[in-house]
């Protein structure tokens, strides 16, 4: 149990069907506008103003899914907690359309990606105020086969002067960050004959700087293409789909030209992670059935490891977690967690959860990627909203040190030895990142200062974002910006 005098508010349980479908949904998020501190309008004209860096603010930008290093860890120091009776200062809020992805923040801009009235919408906001700088739209006809909304799931990525988006139906686009001017676009799902996954496209793009040859910056995405006649009669029978040489594809950021493609694995909802193993850059891509160890320079697959539940209606969505030469995979439908070593470009299994283990005694992540701190892994275990637990697990043994109920399938990031946790039901918590006990420093339901209504409505499935001392959190229909260092 956590040390806290406050009582958790209960959240509505999701239906059985929703539970089965859920897994894809988190790696994602969306965003819109209108602030409680200041109002911004969709009708503002696009601007070509040059992005301004918030260099006077502490810590770093957050230009991609799970931050600059893809592990959900912020370099911010001096987090001001507890927040006091009134909670943290809300700088601005903005309304959302459909979608499940969070913002990316860099150079003074926050880019948000959602769907409104049949169009996928990309907007660039001033990170400090929420003011709309520019907006671009694309028509979309994507329909989720399980009834979830049709907005984007994949988080935009800011790469230098560019922003790259990957829509739910597979439209990959690159635009100038300063004014939204289109640089190139590729209808990936059409060009590579992708059979739609249960929830569309969900894994976010990653960027890699080549060190040899042309030394291009590459955007690497999970594609999972198939033969042109590969569509099964029943669109839910994804077990009948075969891949064809485009599991992962790398494109030149500036031109959109394909640089390499590799593997016949199908796509998952797990965003790949770049890491250094024994002085070599490697990409860890947890595809639909296997984890791949890839040379990002060439796309060469060095090794693979199978880790997925046998159940047809299962997916993997959490990203791999890396510590030194070890990699942790965690899913909730089958085997749970496995710890691998990377030795000479080969995977070596070091431990796995015991057979028939349950989420109450092991780490079985649904979609939220756990964070590592002091040889402990913090995150949510469990498949269903009502019985999910927030836990601290030992990195090497998998043993649970403590567990806390009532937060649903929550997400977290690490900031200055603290965990900022966003519950599925909209509650915001700060916990001490300790194996000894779950010590809650502060918890709050954010309220609109004018109406008293909750700012974060469930479901809250996107991971928090921490950029330049600001915290960005989203619920259904709204993004909220909070100042973490305001005293």
What does each model-found stretch correspond to?
Residues 3, 17, 21, 39-42, ...:
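Positively charged, low-complexity intrinsically disordered regions
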Residues 1-17:
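N-terminal secretory signal peptides that target proteins for export/translocation
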Residues 33-487:
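Noncatalytic, solvent-exposed loop/strand surfaces
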Residues 18-33:
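Bacterial N-terminal signal peptides
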């Amino acid at each position: 149990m956590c040390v806290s005098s406050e009582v958790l508010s209960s959240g509505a349980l999701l239906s059985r069907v929703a539970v089965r479908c859920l897994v894809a949904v988190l790696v994602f998020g969306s965003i819109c506008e209108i602030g409680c501190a200041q109002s911004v309008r969709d009708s503002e004209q696009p601007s070509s103003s040059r992005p301004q860096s918030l260099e006077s603010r502490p810590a770093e930008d957050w230009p991609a899914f799970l931050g600059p290093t893809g592990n959900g860890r912020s370099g911010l120091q001096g987090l001001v907690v507890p927040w006091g009776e009134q909670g943290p200062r809300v700088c601005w809020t903005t309304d959302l359309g459909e979608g499940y992805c969070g913002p990316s923040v860099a150079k003074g801009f926050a880019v948000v990606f959602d769907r409104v009235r049949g169009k996928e919408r990309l907007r660039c906001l001033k990170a400090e105020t929420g003011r709309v700088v520019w907006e671009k739209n694309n028509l979309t006809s994507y329909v989720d086969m399980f009834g979830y909304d049709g907005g984007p799931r994949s988080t935009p990525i800011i790469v230098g002067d560019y922003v790259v988006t990957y829509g739910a139906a597979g439209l990959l686009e690159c635009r100038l960050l300063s004014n939204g001017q289109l640089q190139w676009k590729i209808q990936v799902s059409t060009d590579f004959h992708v059979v739609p996954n249960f929830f569309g496209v969900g894994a976010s793009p990653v960027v890699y700087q080549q060190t040899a040859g042309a030394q291009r910056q590459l955007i690497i995405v999970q594609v999972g293409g198939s033969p042109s006649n590969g569509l099964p009669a029943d669109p839910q029978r994804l077990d009948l789909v075969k891949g064809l040489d485009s599991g992962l594809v790398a494109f030149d950021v500036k031109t959109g030209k394909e640089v390499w493609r590799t593997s016949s694995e199908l796509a998952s909802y797990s965003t790949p992670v770049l890491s250094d193993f024994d002085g070599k850059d490697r990409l860890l891509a947890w595809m639909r059935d296997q984890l791949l160890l890839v040379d990002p320079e060439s796309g060469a697959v060095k090794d693979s490891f199978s880790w997925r539940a046998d159940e047809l209606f299962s997916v993997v969505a959490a990203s791999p977690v890396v510590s030194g030469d070890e990699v942790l995979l965690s899913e909730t439908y089958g085997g749970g967690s496995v710890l691998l070593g990377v030795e000479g470009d080969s995977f070596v299994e070091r431990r796995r959860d015991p057979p028939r283990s349950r989420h109450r005694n092991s780490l079985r992540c649904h979609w939220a990627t756990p964070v590592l701190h002091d040889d402990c892994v913090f995150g949510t275990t469990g498949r269903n909203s009502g019985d999910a637990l927030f836990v601290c697990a030992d990195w090497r043994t998998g043993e649970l040190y403590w567990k806390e109920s009532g937060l649903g399938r929550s997400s977290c990031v690490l900031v200055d030895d603290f965990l900022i946790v966003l519950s599925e039901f909209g509650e915001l918590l700060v916990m001490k990142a300790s194996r000894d006990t779950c010590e809650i420093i502060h918890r709050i339901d954010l309220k609109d200062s004018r109406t008293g209504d909750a700012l974060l409505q469930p479901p809250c499935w996107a991971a928090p974002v921490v950029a330049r001392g600001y915290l960005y959190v989203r619920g259904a229909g709204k993004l909220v910006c909070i100042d973490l260092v305001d005293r």
